[in-house]
Amino acid sequence: MGKIKFVQVGCGKMSIYTMRYAIENGMEIVGAVDINPDVIGKDVSSVIGCEEVGVTIKNVTELDSLLKEVKPDVAIVTTMSLMNDLEEVLMTCAKNGVNAITTCEEAFYPANSSPRITSELDRVAKETNCTITGSGYQDAFWGNLITTLAGATHNITKIKGSSSYNVEDYGIALAKAHGAGLTLEEFDKEVASADRISVEERNKLIENGEFAPSYMWNTNGWLCDKLGLTPISQIQKCVPMTHNEDIYSSTLNMTVKAGDATGMSAVVTTETKEGITIESECIGKVYAETDCDTNEWTVYGEPDTTFVVTRPNTVELTCASIVNRIPDVISAKAGYVPTSQMGELKYQKMAE
């Protein structure tokens, strides 16, 4: 594989690491786009914090012409958290035959939440012979670590996991998606009420592309795909997280009042035909001073095994996972291919 050329889509917090990691990994940045007028027209070095690179950030409206001009091997997309918000960008990549990998949490396994968009991206990507996928922190810490642990287990009855992270680290879109800053009444109306529906109503929302999955919704689908399990039911419940003191959020540029939602806990429970239950929880909130990231999973069966990761550098791990997956994306079959079908996430340093 020769020198990999990439385009960065989204030049916010996450791109600081994805661009630097990719460049340090021997890749060449040939373009970048964003919607923020404060960075458009500037060299990407102003975001990365390095010497001038010679690549100017353009408006995202120029993405199509940029891809046609520079013909990158891959686009790194670090913008939004839901497929509805990314459909246009990913479709632009697919139509141009450009491989794309995104930190979008729903993109980790979108077939179980946005089947129409996933199917259409899959169709176009196959026509143009490119691959679209999602990766990030969950690829390792909610995915491959768990399936590896399962591989060391004789009999499994349940897989249970919980992961927490600071929404401040991921930008305004993610913070708002978690209900951070809302009153409890607003949270109940705008976030929690969406899950007080029947299975039939949820399936209708999914079919119509109107379902808003929590991050573990797609993770459970990924785990089932990787482990060869057949989901027969899946539900989710979102509850607000609060704090007893005011907390300032730099991402939201506001003070979250004591008792208001600092974020949410989302629990997804999946029952499978094989009799294995997967119950996973993600807690995303504006952290107080004493909070820290944690990741804890247990595989129940023979034997029971638990692993705990305390204070993982979630942002850096997310971005390194994206960059380390790029060779897999380039060599994968065409279409929308989740990383559950790409083999294990591994350390990959490319020659200069």
Task: Tell me what each language-model feature is.
Residues 128-156, 311, 319:
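Adenosine-phosphate binding glycine-rich loop
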Residues 99-101:
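A short hydrophobic/small-residue beta-strand
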Residues 285-352:
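C-terminal helical cap and adjacent loop that interface with cofactors, partners, or active-site loops
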Residues 1-96:
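N-terminal glycine-/serine-/threonine-rich beta1-alpha1-beta2 phosphate-ribose binding loop
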Residues 19-20, 122, 143-150, 217-225, ...:
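Predominant activation on well-ordered alpha-helical scaffold segments within soluble catalytic domains
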Residues 12-14, 82-83, 107-112, 136-143, ...:
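Gly/Ser/Thr-rich loops at beta-strand to alpha-helix junctions
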Residues 9, 13, 151-285, 312, ...:
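Active-site-lining helix/loop region of Rossmann-like oxidoreductase modules
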Residues 86, 105-130:
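Rossmann-fold NAD(P)-binding glycine/threonine-rich loop
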